[in-house]
Amino acid sequence: MTKAPIAGNRTGRKLGQRVKNKKMKASSRQWLQRHINDPYVQRAQLEGYRARAAFKLLEIDEKHHILRGAKRIIDLGAAPGSWSQIAAKVTGSTDEDIRVAAIDFLEMAQLPGVKILQLDFLDPTAPEKLLEAVGGTPDLVISDMAAPTTGHHRTDHLRTMHLCEVAAQFAVEVLGEGGHFLTKTFQGGTERELLAMLKQNFRQVVHVKPNASRAESVEMFLLAKGFKGRKVEGDAEKA
């Protein structure tokens, strides 16, 4: 996730205002103007969320109810922390009773009730550290991870899909029965193996593109609901 201010409109500009800076490149000026005029950016600042991405999760939850009843949540690719803010609120997580663990290789400002790990999720030690940090079996694993873009669509898609696959495997290994998994992906085809694995392990698998995702963006989300649980060794042998 792209880093953003913690809260407040630090631009001092009103919605619809143009950006004037002769030294700034046209592309940068265009991006900044779009950012300033984005209604979700304005809402995030007004409501105290660290990023507009908060409304993607809230919109998905409004339709699919993945946050309801969640007691422990793991947030992958968490910076700057808007999803973790929501997770801490719905779980009632506090510094004395941590119920949310967040991980990102980017630095992330501290959040009440959230254990933050500044670490690459692909690090072999990450899964164990996340489980230890969250203090129990998670009901929900959410991932807004995306590989740094190269400008080559196919390469970017493949690199992000790899993160999706690793996150999905992690979710299957740690979720409690009935838990849910949400991950960012890019339009351009979800790998068959990933979909097959999710459908084998979850009761429902759907693609979602919330309104808060920019219309021109190839971003969408893959939601797997109702984890079926892990087979014990004896069950696998009988099958």
Curated annotation (Swiss-Prot):
Subcellular location as annotated: Cytoplasm
Regions of compositional bias (Basic residues) in chain numbering: 11-20
UniProt cross-references to Gene3D superfamilies, sorted A to Z: Vaccinia Virus protein VP39 (3.40.50.150)
Region named Disordered: 1-20
Record's keyword terms, sorted: Cytoplasm, Methyltransferase, rRNA processing, S-adenosyl-L-methionine, Transferase
Catalytic activity as recorded in UniProt: uridine(2552) in 23S rRNA + S-adenosyl-L-methionine = 2'-O-methyluridine(2552) in 23S rRNA + S-adenosyl-L-homocysteine + H(+)
Role this protein plays: Specifically methylates the uridine in position 2552 of 23S rRNA at the 2'-O position of the ribose in the fully assembled 50S ribosomal subunit.
UniProt-listed HAMAP family: RNA_methyltr_E
The protein's name: Ribosomal RNA large subunit methyltransferase E
Organism: Rhizobium leguminosarum bv. trifolii (strain WSM2304)
